[in-house]
């Protein structure tokens, strides 16, 4: 069993709330208008912007949603409150998909005390210069600090650079729930059924992947807590089998491959480099190797990057173009190195008609990367594959086997 999660079907959630526990309710929204999350990540199944309410002697609302959905979210909040007023608005993360509805919320509920980190309040002032939160309506959450609601106690855990500087997570002790900010999130709206891991990996590697050391620090803090449920700001509520999710985050944040396999990423203008990549992929597949092939000019680059982190071996088949790398290959490698790609075996296939330089340039781009082991087999194609190149590809397949 890969996962156990609470998903929210539109028929169950539209205009109403969902119960997480007797006293904790989901009041988030689904976004099927967005095509590119953060202006770059394809999200064919939309996005979820999650928000929660803790009902007790005092009421805490956990985070807001994207501003385009402020009114829908406020309706959800109002239904759960059932005539009561919120005492606290806890802001764990100031990225606009979670904070942009703060002004609308405070206009509706002006007596609410806002709880955030000191840096969170700084960012609030930057994002929303039009609102002024009085000092008595601000509560700066200390690292390790608590907030008593009645039978529920919120414990604040700073999580800087996971993936913004102001981020904190919140542990609710009585229900044993970790409100994890963007941690353990995924792409996709909650009214679309899909496995967690692939879109969570693509989300993590793309958005959080650079900050492995910071995630490791948070995981060490989490290990001291009795966590029975994880409530992220994106994706489903996670429960049961939490070891699966924690193990994935440990792998991803320590830059260790999840499994053995080969990603072959190629850039080809006239199809000759593509033929070499396909030839190698066929050889590897027939030998029993898990092999994934990406045309970098046409694929979802975020998926190609995520798979490079998933598997333990990477083949880059590139061409020389204007005395440099073909642009999509350069962009792909930059996407890897800026996310601290490491602990992998890498092979290079270059193609050039008169002055092939791709191999040298590719290797140079990994100079500062940790524990990148290049294969012994080096392949240079002059325009199109010949018999010698096929023999070299056979040798490379054996070396990668």
What are these regions (language model features)?
Residues 265-287:
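Short, charged N-terminal beta->alpha structural module
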Residues 19-22, 116-167, 211-217:
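Metallo-beta-lactamase
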Residues 17-78, 169-172, 176-180, 273:
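Conserved beta-strand hairpin/beta-sheet module of binuclear metal-dependent hydrolase folds
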Residues 62-64, 86-94, 114-117, 178-182, ...:
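Active-site neighborhood of phospho(di)ester-bond hydrolases with catalytic His/Asp-centered motifs
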Residues 2-17:
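Short, Lys/Arg-enriched N-terminal segments with co-localized hydrophobic residues
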Residues 19, 53, 169-231, 239-266:
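Metal-dependent phosphodiesterase/nuclease catalytic metal-binding core
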Residues 68-115:
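Active-site metal-binding motif and surrounding structural segment of the metallo-beta-lactamase
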Residues 190-230, 234-237, 257, 279-292, ...:
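FMN-binding flavodoxin-like domain, especially the glycine-rich phosphate-binding loop
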